[in-house]
Amino acid sequence: MAQMTVQIVTPDGLVYDHHAAFVSVKTIDGELGILPRHINTIAVLEVDQVKVRRVDDDKHIDWVAVNGGIIEIADNVITIVADSAERERDIDISRAERAKLRAEQEIEEAHDKHLIDQERRAKIALQRAINRINVGSK
């Protein structure tokens, strides 16, 4: 059975390293499903979840919240380089919910004061918090 090696790396180090039969990511151009022997590719990732079906248990799926980044697929090795990434089991949902509330308040304040850059940063923070909540709830 063909397999791929999946590695997710952040500035803090290696977050994820397993063999996979299937990987799904969301790029800026849309969803990308990856099977072994996939064509070599480099793409920019959205803030979204990464789905990994491991080879050791075809019913088990690992979920990782990735905050953007780049994916490289080459010779059955998938490398994701992201600013931050958290496995489903490592996500503190209550902390993510607090971050979501904080981001919503910051969006409202920035909008009222017409602070475009601050509002944009708060929207990205909100998107990241929602992504963490979604992955942590799986």
Curated annotation (Swiss-Prot):
It is a peripheral membrane protein. GO terms for molecular function: ATP binding; proton-transporting ATP synthase activity, rotational mechanism. The keyword rRNA processing does not apply. InterPro entries: ATP_synth_F1_dsu/esu, ATP_synth_F1_dsu/esu_N, ATP_synth_F1_esu_C, ATPsynth_dsu/esu_N. Keywords: ATP synthesis, Cell membrane, CF(1), Hydrogen ion transport, Ion transport, Membrane, Transport. It comes from the Bacteria. The keyword Iron does not apply. One of its GO terms (cellular component) is proton-transporting ATP synthase complex. It is found in: Cell membrane. Coiled coil: none annotated. F-type ATPases have 2 components, CF(1) - the catalytic core - and CF(0) - the membrane proton channel. CF(1) has five subunits: alpha(3), beta(3), gamma(1), delta(1), epsilon(1). CF(0) has three main subunits: a, b and c. Belongs to the ATPase epsilon chain family. Produces ATP from ADP in the presence of a proton gradient across the membrane. This is ATP synthase epsilon chain. It comes from Streptococcus gordonii (strain Challis / ATCC 35105 / BCRC 15272 / CH1 / DL1 / V288).
